[in-house]
Amino acid sequence: MNPDQYSQAIERLNAWAHAYYVLDAPLATDEEYDQLYHEALAFERQNPERIHPASPTQRIGGAPLEGFQKASHLERMWSLEDVFDFGELKSWAERLYKQFPHATFVCDPKFDGASLNLLYEEGRLVRAATRGDGLIGEDVTQNARTIPSIPLSIPLLERIEIRGEVVIPKEDFEKLQEERLRENESPFANPRNAAAGSLRQLDPAITAKRKLRFIPWGVGAHPFKTGSFFEIMKSLESYGFIRSPERTRCHNIHEIERVYALLVSERSTHPVMLDGMVVRVDEIAYQRELGYTIKAPRFACAYKFPAIEKKARLLSITLQVGRSGVVTPVANLEPVEIEGAMISRATLHNFDEIKRLDVREGDWVSLIRSGDVIPKIIQPFAHLRSGEEKPLSRPTHCPECGSELLVEEVLIKCQNLSCPARIKNSLIHFASKKALNIDGLGEKIIEQLFEAGLIKEFEDLFSLTKESLLSLEGFKEKKAQNLLDAIQGVRGCDLWRFINALGIEHIGEGAAKKLSHAFGLAFHLQNHEAIIGLEGFGEEMAQSLLEFCRVNHERIEHLLGLIEPLAPIQLTPQDSPIAGKSFVITGTLSAPREHFVELLTSLGAKVVSSVSKKSDFLLYGESAGSKLEKARELGVRCVNEEELGEILES
């Protein structure tokens, strides 16, 4: 094989792979593909300097990884607002029509898999990252390169983020499950978990065997000038990506509803697991004008499928004690399959709900599950009772520690701060992804450490030794050292993570970030007036925070010394040239919008969504729309990132 023949072989192999994996229309037999593949591979081994970057031999390579690096998205990967019926869809659309009465929409199936963000630069795939928290994910580029439906190169030289869902078709999922059972491995709970787990394999060779597919559903940062989302997605198809055959452009909500009804009817027979339909405004200019709420874009929603209802046997009801002391009844079920997931537990919410439903141990019950929602019992089949079913009495004492329970309206709470269940669940929260994110310290390991008497409170984690870990079942030298390194690695974490990790009732991630920005390391030293003055803080949140900080003052100080969290850089108002100023942000900037919102608010500025005469500044990036024009008309000072930097340095 000479160089010209090699180039032709690579072109032919990629065309065959595209026809097989993307178009589902094979152009060659497996034997023909394998023969040409090995001829190309032989040429590459003899001429390593001539290896083509798009060669299929380059998809799988590299040693197994020790772990995944973090990767920032150029633009945030947002969650979507959910709508559950036609009435909610109509309300969502009517809000849009008030601003843009002639808006059109694009409807896509919502695939139930693992979201992935592909970054291409100068036509080459340079990074693939998981969604993560929407701003920062994990770099899984080596694994993504093994997925045949992800082009290693595209005919677009400008930088672009292409977003989509990594899925396993139902048929391939069943084969994977059978294979795992033959190998005495635990089966996956559902295709989504299988896709996510496959994408996060440290060994790319394992990922390559999993029959993953990448189906694009959108873009992040991009250079397109077209005014249509639908046309952008058509461009991706021309680059070699899979087309969603059900993608439809709609002109009103009745057309949207017809597409939705069709998808619902095809739900069980569709080759890939679906959990709804995504509806987007097609016009890019309208999308920019509509913008985002704190959590989601205003120009798109997820129209969820109806819950699937199944009949199941309720074997028993157990009582769980959470970190706040709330005792929750949980139904243990005879396992039943719903949408590829084996369900063996369901929530009963509280004891008033049990009384209302008249659910008893041993009942046959009607069970529903919708998307990621925890399975829920909606009614018992009373006519099927044999008389042996047992009603559950409302408990008076904690099932874990035996202390007397307190009734607070519909909730029943254990007040014992030393209750083992409360401590364990507090530790689990402390180490969780939304808190200190201690890798390798999950629920089972915490349970093991707790039962062995090695940890009883947060501080004990920092006193663990390799010797104490090696005495536990399942711990070898490397696993013990990795856990110790992960625990020590939380030193210097963001302050909001530290605050969230404390598990203060009513204080979640969002509130923790506000406290971090407003007060820094003195968050626990504030009075009622200061706390209640924060946006979004009500009386209940303020009282909960103040009481927790009063009771745990010394402990917070000790933990601050141990963990040394980093507070956002704060300038006092007199130091900040933009303190008290009002900002509007528009266009595509070099970092996600949230980065600039946090920067500006930390410097005493206020960020608002719309331009008015009262606006002091408009910060604009590329493709700034009508907000920039309006700001100039109103005489609002318009600055780009470079000019903002000059203002802050002045």
Swiss-Prot record:
<keyword id="KW-0227">DNA damage</keyword>
<feature type="binding site">
    <location>
        <position position="304"/>
    </location>
    <ligand>
        <name>NAD(+)</name>
    </ligand>
</feature>
<dbReference type="InterPro" id="IPR012340">
    <property type="entry name" value="NA-bd_OB-fold"/>
</dbReference>
<feature type="binding site">
    <location>
        <position position="131"/>
    </location>
    <ligand>
        <name>NAD(+)</name>
    </ligand>
</feature>
<comment type="similarity">
    <text>Belongs to the NAD-dependent DNA ligase family. LigA subfamily.</text>
</comment>
<feature type="binding site">
    <location>
        <position position="165"/>
    </location>
    <ligand>
        <name>NAD(+)</name>
    </ligand>
</feature>
<dbReference type="Pfam" id="PF00533">
    <property type="entry name" value="BRCT"/>
</dbReference>
<feature type="binding site">
    <location>
        <position position="419"/>
    </location>
    <ligand>
        <name>Zn(2+)</name>
    </ligand>
</feature>
<dbReference type="GO" id="GO:0006281">
    <property type="term" value="P:DNA repair"/>
</dbReference>
<keyword id="KW-0520">NAD</keyword>
<feature type="binding site">
    <location>
        <position position="414"/>
    </location>
    <ligand>
        <name>Zn(2+)</name>
    </ligand>
</feature>
<feature type="binding site">
    <location>
        <position position="401"/>
    </location>
    <ligand>
        <name>Zn(2+)</name>
    </ligand>
</feature>
<dbReference type="InterPro" id="IPR033136">
    <property type="entry name" value="DNA_ligase_CS"/>
</dbReference>
<feature type="binding site">
    <location>
        <position position="398"/>
    </location>
    <ligand>
        <name>Zn(2+)</name>
    </ligand>
</feature>
<dbReference type="InterPro" id="IPR004150">
    <property type="entry name" value="NAD_DNA_ligase_OB"/>
</dbReference>
<dbReference type="GO" id="GO:0046872">
    <property type="term" value="F:metal ion binding"/>
</dbReference>
<dbReference type="GO" id="GO:0003911">
    <property type="term" value="F:DNA ligase (NAD+) activity"/>
</dbReference>
<dbReference type="Pfam" id="PF12826">
    <property type="entry name" value="HHH_2"/>
</dbReference>
<dbReference type="InterPro" id="IPR003583">
    <property type="entry name" value="Hlx-hairpin-Hlx_DNA-bd_motif"/>
</dbReference>
<dbReference type="InterPro" id="IPR001357">
    <property type="entry name" value="BRCT_dom"/>
</dbReference>
<feature type="binding site">
    <location>
        <begin position="79"/>
        <end position="80"/>
    </location>
    <ligand>
        <name>NAD(+)</name>
    </ligand>
</feature>
<keyword id="KW-0436">Ligase</keyword>
<dbReference type="Pfam" id="PF03119">
    <property type="entry name" value="DNA_ligase_ZBD"/>
</dbReference>
<dbReference type="Pfam" id="PF03120">
    <property type="entry name" value="DNA_ligase_OB"/>
</dbReference>
<dbReference type="InterPro" id="IPR041663">
    <property type="entry name" value="DisA/LigA_HHH"/>
</dbReference>
<dbReference type="InterPro" id="IPR004149">
    <property type="entry name" value="Znf_DNAligase_C4"/>
</dbReference>
<dbReference type="InterPro" id="IPR018239">
    <property type="entry name" value="DNA_ligase_AS"/>
</dbReference>
<comment type="function">
    <text>DNA ligase that catalyzes the formation of phosphodiester linkages between 5'-phosphoryl and 3'-hydroxyl groups in double-stranded DNA using NAD as a coenzyme and as the energy source for the reaction. It is essential for DNA replication and repair of damaged DNA.</text>
</comment>
<feature type="binding site">
    <location>
        <begin position="30"/>
        <end position="34"/>
    </location>
    <ligand>
        <name>NAD(+)</name>
    </ligand>
</feature>
<dbReference type="InterPro" id="IPR013839">
    <property type="entry name" value="DNAligase_adenylation"/>
</dbReference>
<dbReference type="Pfam" id="PF14520">
    <property type="entry name" value="HHH_5"/>
</dbReference>
<keyword id="KW-0862">Zinc</keyword>
<dbReference type="InterPro" id="IPR010994">
    <property type="entry name" value="RuvA_2-like"/>
</dbReference>
<keyword id="KW-0464">Manganese</keyword>
<dbReference type="GO" id="GO:0006260">
    <property type="term" value="P:DNA replication"/>
</dbReference>
<feature type="active site" description="N6-AMP-lysine intermediate">
    <location>
        <position position="110"/>
    </location>
</feature>
<protein>
    <recommendedName>
        <fullName>DNA ligase</fullName>
        <ecNumber>6.5.1.2</ecNumber>
    </recommendedName>
</protein>
<feature type="domain" description="BRCT">
    <location>
        <begin position="573"/>
        <end position="650"/>
    </location>
</feature>
<dbReference type="GO" id="GO:0005829">
    <property type="term" value="C:cytosol"/>
</dbReference>
<keyword id="KW-0234">DNA repair</keyword>
<keyword id="KW-0460">Magnesium</keyword>
<keyword id="KW-0235">DNA replication</keyword>
